[in-house]
């Protein structure tokens, strides 16, 4: 059976829909990212063969989840990142991985400029359903957190007939719990 052995490595808050048949369940809600957790494990496995491409992918995951080392970073985050740099990760190449198309950039700018602030939460909605909407919404949610007085952001967008929400916070508001309700 192809899925007979499942390993879960996660840093998010435990959810009701938890994978129950995991052989190994490594959960660390204080880690910055799953990439940080994988990197820590790899450092302790003598036969670890993290090459430059793997190191770059893991560093990209850390940079993405921490918003370039701004959110949820700790000593372990920087130690994992230093290890990945020693293994050949290139920070400029990682930055290029996150480059946007002009269309995505315009969509993000439109979402941010149309946002409303309510009780410390930025709320933006999109009226279109195409292209890199999910990417633009996630980036807009991140960008809205840089507005003074905003503690959380919610960007609503359509995708395939459904309404999705990209939510972010600086830590004071648990947006995951809000979305679960």
Segments (PLM) and residue ranges:
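Hydrophobic aliphatic residue packing
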Residues: 7-8, 38, 150
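Hydrophobic helix-and-loop "lid/oligomerization" segment in the mid-to-C-terminal part
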Residues: 59, 64-181
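Hydrophobic/aromatic beta-strand patches that form the interior of the parallel beta-sheet core
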Residues: 5-9, 24-27, 122, 154-156
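A short, gly/pro- and small-residue-rich
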Residues: 1-15
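Short alpha-helices
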Residues: 11-82
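Short, low-complexity, polar/charged sequence segments that are solvent-exposed and flexible
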Residues: 4-6, 25-29, 44-47, 80-81, ...
């Amino acid at each position: 059976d192809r899925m007979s052995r499942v390993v879960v490595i996660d840093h998010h808050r435990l959810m009701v829909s938890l994978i129950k048949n995991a052989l190994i369940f490594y959960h660390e809600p204080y880690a910055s990212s799953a990439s940080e957790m994988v990197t820590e494990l790899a450092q302790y496995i003598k036969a670890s063969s993290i090459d430059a491409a793997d190191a770059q992918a893991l560093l990209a995951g850390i940079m993405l989840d921490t918003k370039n080392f701004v959110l949820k970073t700790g000593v372990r985050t920087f130690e994992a990142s230093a290890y990945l740099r020693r293994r050949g990760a290139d920070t400029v190449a990682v930055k290029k991985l996150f480059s946007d198309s002009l269309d995505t950039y315009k969509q993000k700018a439109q979402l941010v400029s149309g946002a409303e602030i309510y009780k410390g939460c930025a709320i933006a909605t999109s009226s279109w359903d195409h292209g890199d909407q999910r990417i633009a919404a996630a980036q807009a949610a991140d960008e809205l957190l840089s507005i003074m007085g905003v503690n959380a952001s919610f960007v609503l967008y359509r995708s395939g007939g459904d309404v999705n929400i990209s939510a972010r916070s600086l830590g004071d508001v648990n947006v995951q719990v809000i979305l679960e309700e």
